């Protein structure tokens, strides 16, 4: 719909009157229906151009039965990791003429399911980033809301496409790094209990302990954000550990901030490693050792899988990215005098 020079909105009826056809014919032409005679279609387009008329996106979506929009539900929009996923996904979607609708569940499991259902009703597809809901609930939802793509969560018994990082391997490699520095007393600051990626990290802890019986790792319940890491400092110091692996970079940064306020030197007194390699991890003092996850590529691949589903093509096998260890200044050898 557009506005005439006299301020009145032009409608599909105006175009129909100008072209001498029915409104239904205008609708078919404006939405690319090939059944309309070519000469008639050209007359309609000329009338629309004269009136500066274009069909509204809402009207077009009602006619075509699609919105050219895909919903993305994330558990924590404040986390820069999800920014990277969204950046890659939205850029790739835009290339194919699609838009992204973003919803943040704020780590609330009950809210997550509601958001997924509501946003899916308004969009052509759904991408779930690291959903926190229970496996049975997730599998039921995946069947109800197709097409769906999962990011950083396994699909269980469904055929839903999965794009994820190998958090188990990443954590084992960080533990190996600290082990090679001589650390034998470690702490893992665990993420949200309902987080599947936290479960994979815990698998890494157990696998490492099986191979290194001379090492002790205390698992402390923590969280996923800066404040959680900050608040964990007292428990970390009470553990007498010489090295800490945080659930993610935000937790590691919060811990380092609190340790700094207490006069505890990193890494002289205690080594700290994060996970994800968010954009400012390398600019901390000291720069944060972490496992780098290619989040933008994760988002791009999630869109490619969704595009396959939208076009009724088989989406292919799961894509699992192996994190790359970035050994920086927040980790180092055990200091005997401590």
Residue ranges and their predicted role:
Residues 1-68, 335:
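N-terminal helix-turn-helix DNA-binding module of bacterial transcription factors
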């Amino acid at each position: 719909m557009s506005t005439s020079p006299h301020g009145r909105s032009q409608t599909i009826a105006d175009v129909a009157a100008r072209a001498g056809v029915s409104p239904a014919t205008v609708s078919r032409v404006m939405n690319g229906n090939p059944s309309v005679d070519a000469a008639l279609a050209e007359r309609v387009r000329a009338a629309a151009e004269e009136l500066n008329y274009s069909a509204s996106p809402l009207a077009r979506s009602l006619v075509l039965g699609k919105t050219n929009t895909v919903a993305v539900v994330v558990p924590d929009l404040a986390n820069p990791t999800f920014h990277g996923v969204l950046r890659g996904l939205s850029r790739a979607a835009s290339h194919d003429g699609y838009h992204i609708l973003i919803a943040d569940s704020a780590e609330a499991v009950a809210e997550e399911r509601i958001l997924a259902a509501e946003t899916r009703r308004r969009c052509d597809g759904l991408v779930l980033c690291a959903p926190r809901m229970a496996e049975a609930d997730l599998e039921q939802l995946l069947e109800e809301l197709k097409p769906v793509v999962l990011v950083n969560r396994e699909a269980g018994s469904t055929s839903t496409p999965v794009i994820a990082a190998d958090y188990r391997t990443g954590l084992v490699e960080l533990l190996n790094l600290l082990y090679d520095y001589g650390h034998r007393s470690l702490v893992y600051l665990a993420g949200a209990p309902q987080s599947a990626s936290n479960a994979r990290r815990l698998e890494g802890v157990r696998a490492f302990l099986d191979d290194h019986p001379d090492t002790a790792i205390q698992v402390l319940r923590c969280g996923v954000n800066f404040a959680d890491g900050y608040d964990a400092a007292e428990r970390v110091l009470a553990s007498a550990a010489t090295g800490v692996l945080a659930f993610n970079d935000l937790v590691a940064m919060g811990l380092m901030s609190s340790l700094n306020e207490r006069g505890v030197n990193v890494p002289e007194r205690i080594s700290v490693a994060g996970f994800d390699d968010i954009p400012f991890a390398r600019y901390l003092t000291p720069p944060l050792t972490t496992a780098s996850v290619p989040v933008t590529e994760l988002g791009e691949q999630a869109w490619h899988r969704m595009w396959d589903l939208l076009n009724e093509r088989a989406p292919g096998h799961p894509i699992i990215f192996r994190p790359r260890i970035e050994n920086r200044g927040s980790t180092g050898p055990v200091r005997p005098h401590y």
